[in-house]
């Protein structure tokens, strides 16, 4: 997910996206632990997307 995409979202959309990413991260962690994950790079992508969303949410809350 690109940062420009994230900045264009409303805080409600960001919160919804954050929840869905956390669920996906949870599922991928279990798959990784059992050795079933096929796209291992997706774990890092999701982690970084979560960080980006949290950063934008904080910036919007401060503004």
Curated annotation (Swiss-Prot):
Position of the signal peptide: none
Name a GO molecular-function annotation: structural constituent of ribosome
Q: Which InterPro entries match?
A: Ribosomal_protein_uL29 (IPR050063), Ribosomal_uL29 (IPR001854), Ribosomal_uL29_CS (IPR018254), Ribosomal_uL29_sf (IPR036049)
Q: PROSITE patterns under this entry?
A: RIBOSOMAL_L29
Give the record's keywords alphabetically: Ribonucleoprotein, Ribosomal protein
Q: Name one Pfam family in it.
A: Ribosomal_L29
Q: Which domain of life is it from?
A: Bacteria
- Any one GO biological process: translation
> Mind telling me what this protein is named?
Large ribosomal subunit protein uL29
């Amino acid at each position: 997910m690109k940062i420009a995409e994230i900045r264009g979202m409303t805080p409600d959309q960001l919160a919804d996206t954050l929840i869905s990413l956390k669920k996906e991260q949870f599922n991928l962690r279990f798959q990784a632990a059992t050795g079933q994950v096929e796209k291992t790079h997706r774990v890092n992508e999701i982690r970084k997307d979560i960080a980006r969303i949290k950063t934008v949410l904080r910036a919007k809350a401060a503004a």
